[in-house]
């Protein structure tokens, strides 16, 4: 698999975003699709950052890797769900960024068309497999599963990049043989007639010999902003924790927010909201840190990242301090 590369600072100009943030303001970026959309919409609509005394500026990106590019360029201060793979790579490369939270769990299934002759994961050898673009945690985890659990070489399968709706369309059109799709996407496509042949959770458990699911997205924070606003990182994390708890407690409210902000139908919004507890997390406990370190080693084994992950790449202090905020 192609290595997750260091991201160019020139992205700041290309993205056309504003300059350095003022004290107690925070520029927050997230992908306007996939499972990032749901949490971002609830975070905004509930004004959770404002309730912690912060002034947020939300920046939505059309590409899964764009928030990390913006972070590397200094264009945003916090990404609510940066790709775990890219985040591990850039922090190992020494960029002045810190992982302060695990925020998304890789709750994906490997699926094929209902009438496909493919029955098992081993049958994917020589096939076209749809996944998120190179550089995403989804792509890195897919490669790790195929190459470690099934002894595939990179030449034994063809990865086809795309976002979930596009990959689902490719499957229906028989342009690809299989795809790794988020469970929330599958829930929103009841008429697509897809059949599950494997899951990220089970395959990761086989790979790592541990029960913890793979982490798909992380809260990534800019070190300079953290230094300039020493009490603000804990407030950001507190807001994230409260938004997560809100979603756990009030699924109908989440569905209403998704209908309004994402133009989902009532049925689709309800199906999305029902998956809240299984696709999101807001934590950086010792077990999460251990899981991310293990993930780095798995990615390194398949060439997705290089080097050594420094202990400073994972900063649990904002999470710990957030627990003191009522």
Feature locations, PLM:
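Short, glycine-/small- and polar/acidic-enriched structural segments
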Residues: 24-161, 173, 177-183, 188, ...
């Amino acid at each position: 698999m192609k290595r997750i590369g260091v991201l160019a600072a020139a992205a700041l100009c290309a993205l056309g975003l504003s300059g350095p943030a003022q004290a107690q303001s925070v520029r927050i970026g997230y992908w306007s699709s996939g499972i990032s959309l749901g949490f971002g919409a609830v975070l905004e609509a509930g004004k959770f950052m404002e309730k912690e005394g912060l002034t947020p500026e939300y920046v939505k990106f059309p590409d899964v890797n764009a928030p990390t590019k913006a972070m590397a360029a200094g264009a945003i201060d916090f990404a609510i769900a940066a790709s775990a793979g890219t985040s591990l790579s850039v922090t190992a490369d020494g960029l002045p960024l810190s992982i302060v939270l695990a925020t998304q769990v890789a709750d994906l299934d490997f699926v094929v068309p209902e009438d496909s002759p493919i029955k098992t994961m081993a049958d994917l050898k020589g096939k076209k497999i749809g996944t998120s673009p190179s550089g995403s945690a989804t792509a890195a985890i897919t490669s790790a599963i195929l190459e470690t659990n099934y002894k595939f070489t990179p030449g034994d399968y063809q990865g086809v990049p795309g976002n979930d709706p596009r990959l689902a369309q490719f499957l229906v059109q028989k342009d690809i043989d299989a795809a790794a799709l988020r469970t929330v996407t599958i829930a929103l496509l009841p008429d697509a007639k897809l059949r599950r042949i494997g899951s990220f959770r089970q395959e990761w458990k086989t790979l790592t010999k541990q029960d913890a699911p793979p982490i798909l997205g992380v809260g990534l924070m800019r070190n300079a902003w953290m230094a300039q606003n020493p009490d603000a990182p804990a407030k950001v994390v507190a807001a994230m924790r409260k938004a997560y708890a809100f979603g756990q407690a009030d699924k109908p409210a989440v569905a209403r927010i998704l209908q309004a902000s994402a133009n989902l139908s009532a049925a689709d919004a309800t199906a999305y909201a029902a998956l809240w507890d299984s696709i999101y997390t807001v934590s950086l406990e010792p077990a999460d840190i251990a899981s991310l370190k293990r993930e780095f080693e798995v990615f390194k084994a398949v060439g997705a990242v290089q080097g050594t992950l420094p202990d400073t790449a994972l900063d649990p202090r904002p999470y710990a301090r957030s627990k003191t905020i009522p």
